[in-house]
């Protein structure tokens, strides 16, 4: 029972990171009907932005963890800067790789090829810049056990990640449901032509959608480094597959579906790896993705929720 509780907690933490990245996939698909395969590289850019901030602030891997109060201040700075850089990168990606194709009414295949090309370009650029090496991230917060249930341990670092990520999800949900920008995103998602007739600036809405999705990926990159403490040029690939699987599992194009899919995948991965071994965790993502696409491509929530989109 204690092992089950421990695996559940770990699965929820992993799922929270997946969820923040999956939101970028589902938001873009909602407004453009485009699978932005370069989104995983926006996450990767975020990890290196986090590293850059810690280097500028003078933190290194041989330093002791920070006190919780100072950690909150420093980590907030890291998240804000990483989110800004990732968000700006996502907006630039939309401007360079997708906007001209959209204005020319190019086929979805053209946009898909552009997305794959952008992804490969970013991977190769960072491979050359970082010399294909792993980059360590300093331990900013001590992994102190807050409480224990039998042999299951709940440490403050992962609990902080889970709570912070959930807060971001709630804020995003409220932004989409209750703000003018959110109404614009939902309008474009449901019917772009009608949205134009109603006075919605579609280009601005799409750009802001990429900004939001990219910023969430940047925040996710900070949480990822807090948990795993290293990155490299291709760090976004497997995590991107898991996040995309989460979006498909819940019903791509639907925010709450993506969140549910992410937590479900995190739990499934954790339970499966406890039985099969950790190395099988990513295999589980591929298997689930294939099964969902074959059996229920609209996601586990079905057509009714899928029509709701964002």
What are these regions (language model features)?
Residues 41-45, 99-126, 235-248, 264, ...:
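Pore- or pathway-lining transmembrane helices of multi-pass membrane proteins that form conduits
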Residues 2-10, 14-17, 175-177, 206-246, ...:
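Inter-helical junctions in multi-pass inner-membrane proteins, predominant
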Residues 4-55, 92, 96-106, 110, ...:
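Single transmembrane alpha-helix segments in multi-pass membrane proteins
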Residues 193-197, 201-204, 276-310:
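Cytosolic-side transmembrane-helix boundaries in multi-pass membrane proteins
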Residues 62-114, 118, 260-265, 296:
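Alpha-helical transmembrane segments within multi-pass membrane transporters and channels
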Residues 152-231, 255-260:
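Helix-loop-helix "hairpin" substructures at the membrane interface of multi-pass membrane proteins
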Residues 120-149, 274-282, 301-307:
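Extracellular/periplasmic helix-loop junction at the C-terminal end of a transmembrane helix
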Residues 1-21, 49, 60-77, 104-109, ...:
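Membrane-interfacial amphipathic/re-entrant helices at transmembrane-helix boundaries
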């Amino acid at each position: 029972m204690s092992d089950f509780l421990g695996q559940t907690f770990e699965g929820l933490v992993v799922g929270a990171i997946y969820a923040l990245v999956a939101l970028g996939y589902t938001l873009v698909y909602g407004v453009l009907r485009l699978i932005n395969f370069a989104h995983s590289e926006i996450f990767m850019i975020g990890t290196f932005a986090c590293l850059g901030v810690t280097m500028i602030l003078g933190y290194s891997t041989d330093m002791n963890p920070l006190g919780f109060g100072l950690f909150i201040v420093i980590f907030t700075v890291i998240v804000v800067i990483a989110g800004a850089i990732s968000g700006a990168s996502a907006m630039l990606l939309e401007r360079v790789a997708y906007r001209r194709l959209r204005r020319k009414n190019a086929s979805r295949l053209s946009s898909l090829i552009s997305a794959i090309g952008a992804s490969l370009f970013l991977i190769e650029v960072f491979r050359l810049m970082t010399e294909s090496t792993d980059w360590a991230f300093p331990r900013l917060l001590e992994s102190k056990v807050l409480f224990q249930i039998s042999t299951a341990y709940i440490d403050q670092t992962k609990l902080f990640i889970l709570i912070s990520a959930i807060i971001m999800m709630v804020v995003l949900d409220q932004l989409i449901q209750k703000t003018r920008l959110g109404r614009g995103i939902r309008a474009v998602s449901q019917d772009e032509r009608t949205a134009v007739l109603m006075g919605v600036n579609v280009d601005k809405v799409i750009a802001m959608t990429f900004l939001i999705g990219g910023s969430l990926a940047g925040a996710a990159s900070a949480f990822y480094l807090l948990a795993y403490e290293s990155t490299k040029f291709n760090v976004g690939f497997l995590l991107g597959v898991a996040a995309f699987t989460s979006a498909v599992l819940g019903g791509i194009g639907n925010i709450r579906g993506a969140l549910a899919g992410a937590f479900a995948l995190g739990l499934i991965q954790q339970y499966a790896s406890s039985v099969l071994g950790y190395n099988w965790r990513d295999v589980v993502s591929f298997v689930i993705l294939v099964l969902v696409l074959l059996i229920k491509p609209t996601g586990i929530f079905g057509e009714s929720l899928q029509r709701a989109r964002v």
